[in-house]
Amino acid sequence: ADADVFGFDMSHVDVLKAQTNFKEFDESSSNKSCSFGVTDGRKLPFNNNSFDYVICSEVLEHIIDFESVIEEIERVLKPGGIFAASVPKYLPEWICWKLSKAYQEMPGGHVRIFKYRHFKKSIEQRGFSFLKRHWNHALHSPYWWLQCMFWETKETSWIINKYHDFLVWDMMKKPFLTKVLEFVLQPIIAKSCLLYTSDAADDTSR
């Protein structure tokens, strides 16, 4: 399918890392393009109604005035376009904050914990219509709890490294047992809450 994809972050280092990682999945095609750049999510360098789809993954919890990012996304998204947003789910994130003060104070880290109703309402109030909700990465939450518990030694911790190996194995092999565990645990300890919405704005209102 034809696709022009743009990826942005405020961190130049992270953008370079994304470019490097993308090369492993790049498929040469005249019908596809992928560009990366550094920008502020509150001031996207695009005209109104530029995109069919916008994904904002694990970003809003880092931004004090996150509403301005949602408004900017609404501006660049075409009427009827799809906006997918994810933030950390409340309970697993709350546990991280309780386990480690350093986790809270990490530069560029999370400045809030979203409750689902607030998250959903904040998006709907800015011109989006709710489509569906999805939870993900329940098996990843214990990994972050372990990092918070052993924050000072997390780079060398045996148990953290082993759990990371388990997560990589799970992602690569996708065994039936972990699929069942993920499904059962998602309503309780899913790491991420995802919302899928549609831009309900009329083109003439832009």
Model-inferred region functions:
Residues 136, 170-198:
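Conserved Class I S-adenosyl-L-methionine
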Residues 23-25, 101-104, 148-152:
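Short, hinge-like loop/turn segments at secondary-structure boundaries
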Residues 88-112, 121:
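Short, glycine-/aromatic-enriched active-site segment of Class I SAM-dependent methyltransferases
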Residues 132-169, 194:
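Conserved catalytic loop of SAM-dependent methyltransferase domains
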Residues 1-95, 118, 205-206:
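Conserved SAM-binding loop
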Residues 196-206:
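Single conserved hydrophobic/aromatic residue that forms the stacking wall/gate
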